[in-house]
Amino acid sequence: MRHMRPLIALSLAGLMTLSACGEDVAAKDDSAAGSSAAGGSNNSAPAKDGGSITVRGCTPQNPLIPSNTNETCGGNVLDAVTARLIHYNPDTAKPEMDIAQSIETKDNQNFTVKIKPGYKFSDGTKVKAQNFVAGWNWAAYGPNAQQSGYFFEPIEGYADEQCGDEACKTKPKVKTMSGLKVVDDHTFTIKTTEKVSNLKVRLGYTAFAPLPDAFLKDPTNKKWEKMPIGAGPYKVTDNTATAITVAKNENYAGAYQGHVDKVTFKIYNDASPAYNDTVANNLDINDLVPTDQLTNDQWKSDLSGRWAIRQSGINQTLTYSGKDKQLASNKDLVKALGMDLSLIHI
């Protein structure tokens, strides 16, 4: 019988998310108790280094480019593949220095960033200040139509990089933001249009990951969409319609080294097949419990001794389609529906 163990090798935000309950559910080693209460500690046994595991994945909605991935399916993969200036502690969510050696400011508008020497991308090239500055300029450039391009809006000159119209028939004034300057290989500066007190915290978002020289020289090459080059603890080795596999990045120089050698994100676009595979021990880690298994905590019985719960911050919204003419033209009806919905039952 294959043992289930916690995926502590990857920094996957919301790794074990219990749908609609605001809690995290994680598979645990069989030797550990599987009944920790919500908000309780995770008492799973220590995972051993090496080997491989399978994790529930889903089809990325966009290419695996840091600034173009803003959903969980692709985000979980890029969390393993990329390193950023800031790393979020998986237990406390507090920002910690990763590639950044220091981020200093006296006025929350002018920032000096120094990066640690020795970091490399998975292709063996060095991570330099230019990889951040050029990468951010490319990501913010309107014609590149990046899903997360708006993350760079606080930086001076962002507006000048945007298209003059929705169809982008009027090209931007510039291709680089005036608020970004390379000082040397390990130093660059950021100037924002106004004071931004939490900029340091934001710099851990995937969109701010540095882009390698190979990408910057040929950004339209389709291979980057499925086989990204990052500076994180893992690298993508295979990407198909049914699975995305990442293996340890031998060039990784950071403090967040992975424990397992290989992780395969098996693609499931429905919660039930993934759940059934988990129960049958054909899937090691699953972060989603089907709603029909939540009744009477059926999933706890099915996965006895192999689960854990922890608190998680989840933002959920309920909206209606703008194409629904009846709702779009009747604000009172929308309000009535909202008042009728009981949050207790959602």
Which ranges hold each PLM region?
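Secretory targeting and sorting signals
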Residues: 1-25
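Bacterial lipoprotein signal-peptidase II cleavage site
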Residues: 21-35
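N-terminal lobe/hinge region of extracytoplasmic solute-binding protein
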Residues: 56-107, 229
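Aromatic- and charge-enriched surface segment that lines or borders ligand/interaction sites
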Residues: 101-151, 189, 280, 327
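Surface-exposed binding/hinge segments that line
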Residues: 104, 140, 144-213
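Alpha-helical secondary-structure segments
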Residues: 128-137, 185-191, 232-233, 260-262, ...
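Gly/Pro-rich hinge or "lid" segments in bacterial periplasmic/extracellular proteins
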Residues: 186, 192-257, 262
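Extracellular/periplasmic solute-recognition and catalytic clefts
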Residues: 237-247, 264-328, 336
